[in-house]
Amino acid sequence: MEPQLNQEVINTAALHDGPIETDAVIVGAGPVGLFQVFELGLLEIKAHIIDSLAYPGGQPIELYPDKPIYDIPAIPVCTGKELTDNLMKQIEPFGPTFHLGQEVSVLEKQEDGRFFVETSKGTKFLTKTIFIAAGVGAFQPKLLRVDGLDKFDNSQLFYRVKNPADFAGKNLIIVGGGDSALDWALNFVAEGPNKAESVILIHRRDGFKAAPANVAKMKELCDAYEMQFIIGQVTGYDEKEGRLTAAKVTGADGITRVVPLDVMLVFFGLSPKLGPIAHWGLDIERKQIKVDTEKFSTNIPGIFAVGDINTYPGKKKLILSGFHECALAAFGAAPFIFPDKKIHLQYTTTSPKLHKVLGVESPVFD
């Protein structure tokens, strides 16, 4: 479920003839990457954001868009989608430019101290600073390995649900044993506009890594013949006239059953990969970037790392910790962008300058 996007904010940059010259490039559009835009914006530093996903929000949007989050200060509870929507609204005044569905493939230090950055789609930048907010790396879905099945990708085989309405009235096979598989199985069985014609859940064993209440609900629905659960693994498929018509499911008994379908949804989880980041010359420890906690700078001057991607003594992988890191990283980066300017700490409650930057009126006190 993708976040609500303001087109002016989310407008992905058009192709440029030459590199885009900018003060800051943020790698990662999860909550911490989005809040980095805000902290930089308060210091009048404009940013471009790159993310491998086709939409902002990172892990909360990809893994738990509808799950409640309880540990964001002053927000008793919100979902991953609500958190993303609120962050997108918060950064609107700073007009960041998003470059989505692409990864950084090249990073080179230039003689003038700037960095040359190129993405997998050929977008090029010359930037004074880089903020790596890539979480645990670029997310790639874990694939169902059946020879030839990949030719049905994004037509009848899907690894995520963008629009539930696309699957309404269909005969669905859902493969997996985690929260996503159970959540979507229950979603498509439920009465409503997205109800499927039939739902068959396939998992290799009877145990699940999912919320016990959802597992119990699934078994209730099976007992009521409203859906089916088959223990086994997809080992093959049938097709007719270029269309996927059935999955071959082999059980622990060695018997292979042919299960008709319209669409197959696979939820094996997402595999985070550091990708090219691992080859940028950064000091990496157990797939995390080492930083100092004064500025959250890396061993390469001008490159900062915030959020789950970094490590330091006492590190806790919490969204609120990442927000704190963004503030210090922004102040740490300011001298690279404004070498002759003294940066003063100002407060959004009282600073007319920050009110102007934020596009709000300064309060008048009697």
Swiss-Prot record:
Q: Which Gene3D superfamilies match?
A: FAD/NAD(P)-binding domain (3.50.50.60)
Report the cofactors.
Answer: FAD
Presence of keyword Metal-binding: no
Source domain of life is: Bacteria
User: What's its EC?
Assistant: 1.18.1.2
**InterPro entries per record:** FAD/NAD-bd_sf, FAD/NAD-binding_dom, Fd--NADP_Rdtase_type_2, Ferredoxin-NADP_redctase_2
Record keyword Oxidoreductase present: yes
A Pfam family for this UniProt protein?
Pyr_redox_2
Binding-site positions, FAD = D51, Q59, Y64, V104, F139, D308, T349
Q: What reaction is this protein's catalytic activity?
A: 2 reduced [2Fe-2S]-[ferredoxin] + NADP(+) + H(+) = 2 oxidized [2Fe-2S]-[ferredoxin] + NADPH
A GO molecular function held by the record: flavin adenine dinucleotide binding
Q: How is the cofactor bound?
A: Binds 1 FAD per subunit.
Keywords in UniProt for this one? FAD, Flavoprotein, NADP, Oxidoreductase
Q: Which family does it belong to?
A: Belongs to the ferredoxin--NADP reductase type 2 family.
Q: How does it assemble?
A: Homodimer.
Q: What is this protein called?
A: Ferredoxin--NADP reductase
> Source species, please?
Polaromonas naphthalenivorans (strain CJ2)
Q: What is the lineage of its organism?
A: Bacteria, Pseudomonadati, Pseudomonadota, Betaproteobacteria, Burkholderiales
